[in-house]
Each structure stands twice: as C-alpha cells, then as structure tokens.
C-alpha cells in the first residue's frame, strides 16, 4: 500500500512539470468567472511553476494561458472580487497576492488529472476537459 501511494505521488510530481500554457488575448470579461477553491487549508503546494495570462473561458472557467489550459483550483481562502467594467481580481489564499484577470502571472502548484470533489463550488462539466492546476504561490509579472 505504501509503495502504491509513493508511486502515485511520484506520478503527480512528474506530471506537474509538464504544463506549458500559451498566451491569450487581453479583453474585458463579459462572463462571470467561477472561482474554484480547495476545501482543504494547507501551507504546502506542489513545486512546478506555470506562466501566462490569467483568463476566463466562455464557460466562466479560470485558466492560465488559453481555453485548453487546465482549470485552476485556487488555494483555500482565495477570493474573487468584481472591480466593475468587466474587471475581476483574484486574491490567492496561499500568499494573499492579488492579480486582475488578464494580467501575466507566474503560478506555482502542479498538474492534477483527477477531478477533485474537495472543492467549492463543484467543478462543472464545462470546466473539466483539460485537467486541473492545483495552485500554490502566485506572482504578478
């Protein structure tokens, strides 16, 4: 059982380094973004890093780079704030750093292929097609 768990964790660690998002265009958001957050408070995260533009796809899913990038699952305590005029700010619950959707960021964490049930709100089918990025520390570029 311990060997299976170790292999599982090694697989997640290795796949977390394989994300390479591309850059999407910058436009005001006409769809209400859906901030998916972990239900579990933690002070650790995976160690991979991805960089790109924080975007919202046509279904309201928040991604990094383009509409085929993994859905971002934000740390426990993360917040979404409507700034008006189609602008939204996300405050990362892991580091308390904030970024406006459309900004270039670097986001720590790692790729996760299994749909998590330990999130709020539940992940919709429209957001579940391209895997998940379990977010850690964030830095605005």
Which residues does each predicted region cover?
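Bacterial signal peptide processing site
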Residues: 18-20
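A short macromolecule-binding patch
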Residues: 68-77
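Flexible glycine-rich surface loops and low-complexity tracts that mediate binding to linear polymers
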Residues: 88-125
